[in-house]
Amino acid sequence: MTEEVYQNLQKHLDQFPIGYPATKTGVEIRVLQHLFTPEEAEIAINLKLAYETLENIHKNIENHISLAELEIALDTMVSKGLINFKREGENKYYAIIPLVVGIYEYQVDKLTKEFIEDFEQYKDNEFALELLSTKNLQFRVIPLEQSLTPENLVASYDELRKIIENIEEDSIGLTKCICRQSKDLQGQPCSKTSERELCLYFGNTGRLFLDQGWARPINKDETLELLRKAEKDGLVLQSGNTKDPEFICCCCECCCGILSKAKDIPRPAQFLASNYYAEVDKELCTGCGTCLERCQMNALKLVNNISKVNLKRCIGCGLCVSTCPEEAIHLRKKETEVVPPSTVDDLYAEIAQIKEELRQKMKK
């Protein structure tokens, strides 16, 4: 019976846009067992991606649990980073969340070696295929400020300063990078930076992190300073793929599950949303190789002592631009602009549509 409740939870999670596919090894069940008690798994099966009130959730649960008992259980699940939560006035709202971005990121300061071992196995196999099947539209690359030239008409969702300006300052939470925490526990510390507080959350998610003590508050000026330092350290800025993102992470290919997976495939440019690509001025390039060292996607190589960009691999982050001593590289805007969805709900709807189109193609 205990095994069955986790199997039911796996099926429940798998029906959402960011699914939770089954495996032959059962590792996906072990991941859930690390996180949920059987009682919590039973409750989670009754939750939706859309926020619901405590009272509505109680109506959906068949087992005999009082409203007060359910509230305690849900609040415990929130504190464990298993579900989403927000408060509006006196009302409390709860929702299910996917494994990524969601449950995994909410495990900051709660990781164990046993969980990491099973999570890594799942992440590198069936779950990786799940993310790849959606082209990973949960993420977009924000180009470095100094890499954008005046002739580039930069949309607000591509301009770091505008993104931060639009955020409510009391919702900004700075937390430790879950990917680097995981690598530290595995004895594989980050090769790019010794910093660990490198993930920012905003809006409802930021308030959740702050309320739960998973993050500390910082202001907008501190936020911009942190992100600019991350750029200097050679980190790629990735945000949620919405017009007003609820997170920005400072990423590297040695720790970040998304960037490392992108680097492993032939065409990272198709895997990460970005509106830019790097272009080299052959007349100015001296072949010093600085850009090759900065690029995390192996998108640059020297041909006849001149840097050449592989457009299939370039994700438009601008790391190569900001440190070119000859100013021979600049970012060029793509002809077709990728406009992010307005909200997370719109994002999930877009991902669901892409997955359905793929299913229909596979049937033919």
Predicted feature locations:
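Iron-sulfur cluster-binding cysteine motifs and their immediate structural context
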Residues: 52, 56, 60, 82-86, ...
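Flanking helices and flexible, charged tails adjoining ferredoxin-like Fe-S electron-transfer domains
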Residues: 311-364
